UniProtKB/Swiss-Prot annotation:
Belongs to the NADPH-dependent diflavin oxidoreductase NDOR1 family. This is NADPH-dependent diflavin oxidoreductase 1. It comes from Kluyveromyces lactis (strain ATCC 8585 / CBS 2359 / DSM 70799 / NBRC 1267 / NRRL Y-1140 / WM37). Residues 226-474 form the FAD-binding FR-type domain. FAD binds at residues 384, 414-417, 446-449, 624. Keywords: Cytoplasm, FAD, Flavoprotein, FMN, Mitochondrion, NADP, Oxidoreductase. It comes from the Eukaryota. GO terms for biological process: iron-sulfur cluster assembly. NADP(+) binds at residues 539-540, 548-552. One of its GO terms (molecular function) is flavin adenine dinucleotide binding.
């Protein structure tokens, strides 16, 4: 039973905040603290009035925004969410004075608005609406350079475990005893090898027979999410050279209702596993294979949030769950091991070898409960080892399929920027196919991009369209400086075709002019027509790019122009591409340009000017 007085809320873009929230929930359950665990966007606003202890773990996305599942509900609507409610100006200053709150922010200090998500929540919930902090807000930095782990070199995990330790100590101090069978007794945690059964359990349906001959693949349906749309594939063309190692796709589909979209909007696609990976999983768990095509039901389905985004597959079997819902090719997170290590036991499909069994159980337990995560990182993250491969490695791991919804990660939609013109009846995406070799010398493929490679003309794709409201009226009509290496070009292409800006300057970079100059003909035509001012660079092609290796080099080469646009014409700077060094170097270059040409007295003034640009959305950054 959920306890409305103790609530764990999370807002997560990549899954880190979600996993930490699930770990915290797992630890509290083992101490017999019943509670509610839910995404911020799905938490009913009125429930906060009954809450006494509120634990929030939240990351930051975009221009310092809350993650999508924090500002929208599972149906993609912001209306009626907790955040919309909390932003109401009419709320009294003591609305949350009954709430004791602890907050953890997950961020990356290479972004200008580091941990703004949790800071927004903190400002509103604590400073403006009266909630009491159990302890000061903690902030983690993926780079280990800022926030609560500043200068320590420690990752977000160390900050999370400090957060967890403080919460558990606080709750045990408040409630050292618990009531059991009408009597008070000391609050002692469950032994680690005791598995906590979830509320959502898979059961074989009372309908007899398998599904093999009942519903062919063409009859696969998804129910429970009315916001899902179905597009028809029109193009799936490689737009890099055929002999180039990076396959980039122009992926075009016709929308179901010809929905309107705008520059900066995105589309989420719902991928699926390959039949081969599904079969490999079933072979690694023979007891699953025996019932793989039996019809299933889910207990307490109405309170299962795992299918709210995208709906649940019908017919529901282990095979269809593995194909359409369980992300068996993702890298397992610590919570996976925390919940499954106890299932490593001698069984009929694996001859008993007590020494090996103990080794495997100890290793799985260490991955699940160890606070020094280096071994887990070396085993899973560094070689990009998948859930499927873990199950193949640990032969004694016999997973009960009945509890699969508790420990297997779910396939999440993948988000892509729209690159077609807003007037186009179709949606065009520009997608880099993920394919690489790891330390294990195995070829890795991205789940969604591998799925996209299987799609041909007239195939159906499941999608949702997100209106992100990137641009506001105050900046439209001004000059714009667009910096976009690689597929970061996608939203720029949409923006250029929208004709919303007076003068458009595009700085595009990639590796080789003859291999991956994306949309070269289109960009060259726009340059000839005077639609854009185009500056290119190619990092591995010094013949065609002798004076600029990276986009920041080309910006510096045009420093006088850039300074004039920013300082005299109030130009907008928009950066889009992969995270890491690029956005940091571009920002540093812009600061140096301002220092050189801006007549600022010192570097601090130039930095202050750029921060003011960020505050007023004249400097925008979208990276992934």
């Amino acid at each position: 039973m959920q306890n409305k007085k103790i609530v764990i809320l999370y807002g997560s873009e990549t899954g880190n905040a979600q996993d930490f929230a699930h770990i915290l929930s797992h630890k509290l359950k083992r101490l017999h603290f019943s509670h509610t665990l839910i995404k911020i966007g799905d938490y009913h606003p009125k429930s906060v009035l009954q809450c006494k202890y509120l634990f929030i773990i939240c990351s930051t996305t975009g221009q310092g925004e809350l993650p999508r599942n924090a500002r929208e509900n599972c149906n993609g609507r912001a209306q009626g969410t907790l955040w919309q409610f909390l932003k109401k100006s009419t709320l009294p200053a003591d609305l949350l004075d009954h709430v004791n709150v602890a907050m953890l922010g997950l961020g990356d200090s290479s972004y200008p608005r580091f941990n703004f998500g949790i800071r927004k929540l903190h400002e509103r919930i604590v400073n403006q609406l009266g909630a009491s902090e159990i302890f000061p807000r903690l902030e983690a930095d993926e780079l280990g350079l800022a926030g609560s782990n500043k200068d320590t070199g420690n990752g977000v995990e160390s900050v999370y475990y400090e957060f967890e330790k403080r919460i558990i100590a606080y709750m045990l101090e408040k409630y050292p005893n618990r009531k059991h069978d009408g009597k008070m007794m000391p609050r002692v945690g469950l032994a680690e090898d005791v598995y906590l059964k979830p509320s959502n359990i898979l059961e074989i349906s009372t309908v007899n027979g398998s599904t093999n001959d009942q519903l062919p693949d063409s009859k696969i349906q998804f129910v429970g999410d009315e916001t899902i749309r179905h597009g028809t594939v029109k193009k799936n063309n490689q737009i890099t050279a055929k002999d180039h190692f990076q396959d980039v796709r122009q992926f075009v589909f016709e929308t179901e209702d010809h929905e309107a979209y705008h520059p900066g909007d995105t589309v989420s696609l719902y991928p699926e596993n390959s039949d081969n990976d599904v079969e490999l999983f079933l072979e690694a768990q023979p007891h699953w294979k025996k019932v793989a095509d039996e019809l299933l039901t889910i207990t307490d389905l109405e309170n299962c949030d795992r299918f709210r985004d995208g709906g649940v597959v019908k017919p529901l079997t282990l095979r269809t769950l593995l194909k359409y819902h369980f992300d068996i090719v993702s890298i397992p997170r610590q919570s996976f091991f925390m919940k499954t290590w106890t299932f490593a036991n001698a069984h009929e499909d694996r001859p008993t070898d007590q020494e090996l069994l103990e080794q495997q159980r100890d290793k799985l337990r260490q991955f699940g409960y160890g606070q020094d995560l280096q071994d887990l990182y070396d085993y899973c993250n560094r070689p990009r080892r998948s859930v499927l491969e873990v199950i193949q490695d640990f032969e004694f791991l016999k997973l009960p399929w009945e509890f699969a919804l508790d420990y297997l990660p779910m396939i999440k939609p993948r988000f892509y920027s729209i690159s077609s013109a807003p007037s186009d009846p179709n949606v065009e995406l520009t997608i880099a196919i993920v394919r690489y070799k790891t330390l294990l010398r195995k070829v890795r493929k991205g789940l969604c991009t591998n799925y996209l490679l299987t799609l041909t003309e007239n195939d159906t794709v499941r999608y949702k369209l997100q209106n992100n409201h990137l641009l506001h009226e105050d900046i439209i009509g001004k000059p714009i400086i667009m910096t976009s290496p690689g597929v970061g070009l996608a939203p720029m292409k949409c923006l250029i075709e929208s004709n919303l800006f007076k003068d458009q300057y595009l700085f595009f970079g990639n590796r080789m002019k003859d291999k991956d100059f994306l949309y070269e003909d289109t960009l060259s035509m726009w340059k000839k027509e005077g639609k854009i001012n185009l500056f290119t660079c190619f990092s591995r092609d010094p013949i065609n790019s002798p004076h600029a290796k990276y986009v920041q080099d080309q910006l510096w080469n045009q420093s006088s122009l850039i300074a004039d646009l920013i300082l005299k014409k109030s130009a907008i700077v928009y950066i889009c591409g992969s995270s890491g060094k690029m956005p940091v170097q571009v920002r540093l270059t812009i600061v140096e340009i301002l220092k050189k040409h801006g007549n600022f007295e010192n570097a601090e003034e130039a930095e202050h000017y750029l921060k003011e640009m960020e505050r007023t959305d004249r400097y925008m950054q979208e990276t992934w």
